[in-house]
Amino acid sequence: MLDQETKKKINDLRDTLVGKVPDPKSQVEQIMIALIYKFMNDMDKESTDLGGEASFFVGDFEKYSWDNLFGTKVSGSELVDLYSTAVESMEDNPNIPQLFRDIFKNAYIPYKDAETLRLFLSQIDDFEYSKDSEQLGDAFEHILNSLSSQGDAGQFRTPRHIIDFIVEIVDPKKDETVLDPASGTSGFLISAFKHIVNSNSEKSSGDLLSAAERKKIMKNINGYDISPDMVRIGLANMYLHGFPEPNVVEYDALTSEDRWNEYYDVILANPPFMTPKGGIRPHNKFGVKSNKAEVLFVDYILTHLKPKGRAGIIVPEGIIFQSGKAYKEL
């Protein structure tokens, strides 16, 4: 459970950004990259404090360390230039893992106001990297609450209680593969992992699972999303929930055939059911003839379940009550 002090810190971050970054998704992205930036510096500091060496801010990237952003001789314009350059070039940092490079892919700072940036970074500085992934994950989930309204292409962030309810009903097991073909912020994937861990607990969380079993469970959990921005947010969310190498990729399940032959025991989804003007142009492998997103996603999910597989899908009521041929075929 997230404490009130941490909630206030997160709300203050959004309040600081809202004048320069009014879009909620952009606010989340700015907070996300700043937190990962800060946490990389914290991990470097932890390593050097223990007698080791820094891993992330070394070589050509040493000048971008978090501490250098707060140097007493750094002017406002220098801070904007330093931080902006660091964020935009971080995906090319050879010293950071691929996951972090993916999170920083195409990242940039959409404002140049030094006062706003200095305040924002000082607020980020209050957050510290913790090996307690539950605490970090809960904090990021609170940030993601701002995405609950409709976004591009009919995307919605599914409320946590609905996600958990569906996952509980579908009941994924520790040896089963799980997919969300429209994973967004990765809420279903994280809930599925927590459900499996809790189902294998006796005295403490996941105490009936070996380290190898936990690793396998994480490897079995997969997500696709058509939006590169949502992939980055989903990757960060999973990382902050303890996934060292989350399996979320940019992929359009309705128009690409590259992953058509992949099948899963469990599929969980709340797909974006808004069909673009002119309809979708799907490939020829679908069992129903339609250019409607809701029809195609349901058909995709049913087709990609393994024998005896199970699915939990949030669908518009039209799937049940429409009388068109494609709806009836489903």
Residue ranges and their predicted role:
Residues S146-L147, G278-H283:
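Gly-rich Lys/Arg/Thr-decorated short loops/hinges at beta-loop-alpha junctions or inter-strand turns
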Residues Q155-A269, M274-P276, K285, N291, ...:
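Conserved S-adenosyl-L-methionine
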Residues D175, L305-A311:
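Short glycine-dipeptide loop
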Residues L296-P307:
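A short glycine-rich, Lys/Arg-flanked "PGG" loop and its adjoining helix->strand segment in the class I
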